[in-house]
Amino acid sequence: MNTFADYILEEEELGSKMEIAYYLSKKEKVFFDKSIVFKTEIARLFLNYSKIEVDKNFVLTACLLCNCKKVDNAQDINKIHTYAKEGADYLREMGFGKRFCKVCEEINRYSNSNPRERESDILELVDQFGGMLLDRPERIGFKPDEALVLLEHRNLKDEYNRYLHTFIEFVNFLEKIQINDLVSMTALRRLVKIHNETEELTKFIQKVVYEFEPKIDKLIAEQNEEIAEEMFSKVEDANRPLFSEETTRKIMAHIHDDPRMKQEGQV
């Protein structure tokens, strides 16, 4: 008999996977809100950009479920320190494998689990960066460049994350992508705007999967094409002689006058 773990891992379409996680949250009272969908979309974009050799389906499923025992209360310090471990234990009961649960536990570093899995480093970056972009009761969301500075020089100042610099490159790349609707704005700002203006979780999922994703994927493809064309335009004709005709004459004259060449019988 298939477990819940089998069911959600076998579903490779991200929108359907999000719906499964949503219905689990209703049945089991686990944590699943718009911020999870928001962060998972950032994870999807990062995986597409970076081409890191990981199982994309595995990572996105973990991104949807790793916060399952989180509480929406920043003042509950004890819970902040334990929710990742509690979530991993819960997911193990739901049929997920040991490594999947370890990856979810390592979304933060409170359990001191080492050595860290590489997928955990992806979850950590997405969770911390994505969280800083969103408003919280005690503060408004940070701009992407501000969030990157805090991520690198505060949150991970004394920690090693193998994908940090790749993630910074990814965010800087994404900040160059403009989405034009009624008002032109960057891709991340647009995603934040959709998050803030869409109250219902199910509607937010639909807007992300069926409106935002096709648009941003097309724009990224166009941006990559422009970059490739720019690179190729800088490459001169491969059949062009290495030296100009004038340079060739000078070199040949020099060789002709060089006594070493005459001694070796090359002239």
Tell me what each language-model feature is.
Residues M1-R92, A253-V267:
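Acidic/His-rich, divalent-metal-binding segments that scaffold phosphate/diphosphate chemistry
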Residues V59, C63, L91-V126, G130-D237, ...:
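Histidine/acidic-rich helix-loop-helix segments that form or flank divalent-metal centers
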